[in-house]
């Protein structure tokens, strides 16, 4: 009698969020164009990122807006992630994964994303994409009421598990480098 091995549903990984960041490095017209571009690409209103400290060499003051970012969750995150992965050819370097299951990679030009056209008024921007993976039940440690401790074996997502998740769900090829 062959027994089928069941997988614990609480051990399955899921996509928590996709964070998209465009760092401009200065306030002004380019920052407004990056804001407009990110809003068009994602359909979500971006937030401004501000400088943590003054860097005189770059002309950046503490508290000045220097970039825009968007956090996507749920279906929007999956749809945008599929588009962005198509822009990089469904290939991610192994060095893009950290030991907690997060993945980060960059896109040199937003025009590489399928369905995006070049607009001379906006110009060309690069962007950083960060993917966060979690297990179900992770909210227990973050919620406001009745917080509880989550064991380390459930809390951490290994690099190998994250790679396998992206291979299975998004047809990603992991490249050494």
UniProtKB/Swiss-Prot annotation:
An example Gene Ontology molecular-function term: tRNA binding
Pfam families listed in its UniProt record: Ribosomal_L5 (PF00281), Ribosomal_L5_C (PF00673)
GO biological process, one term: translation
Keyword hit for Manganese: no
Signal peptide: none
Record text on subunit structure and interactions: Part of the 50S ribosomal subunit; contacts the 5S rRNA and probably tRNA. Forms a bridge to the 30S subunit in the 70S ribosome.
Listed name of the protein: Large ribosomal subunit protein uL5
Lineage of producing organism: Archaea, Thermoproteota, Thermoprotei, Sulfolobales, Sulfolobaceae
């Amino acid at each position: 009698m062959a027994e089928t091995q069941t997988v614990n549903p609480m051990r399955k990984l899921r996509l928590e969020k996709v964070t998209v960041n465009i760092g401009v490095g200065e306030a002004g017209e380019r920052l407004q164009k990056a804001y407009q571009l990110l809003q068009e690409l994602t359909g979500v209103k971006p937030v401004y990122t501000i400088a943590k400290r003054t860097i005189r060499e770059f002309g950046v003051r503490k508290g000045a807006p220097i970039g825009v970012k968007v956090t996507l969750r749920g279906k929007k995150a999956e749809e945008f992630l599929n588009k962005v992965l198509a822009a990089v050819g469904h290939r991610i370097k192994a060095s893009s994964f950290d030991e907690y299951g997060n993945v980060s990679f960059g896109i040199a030009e937003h025009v590489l994303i399928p369905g995006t056209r070049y607009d001379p008024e906006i110009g060309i921007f690069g962007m950083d994409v960060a993917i966060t993976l979690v297990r179900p039940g992770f909210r227990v440690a973050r919620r406001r009421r009745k917080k509880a401790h989550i064991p380390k074996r459930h809390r951490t997502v290994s690099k190998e598990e994250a790679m396998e998740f992206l291979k299975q769900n998004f047809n990603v090829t992991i490249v050494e480098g």
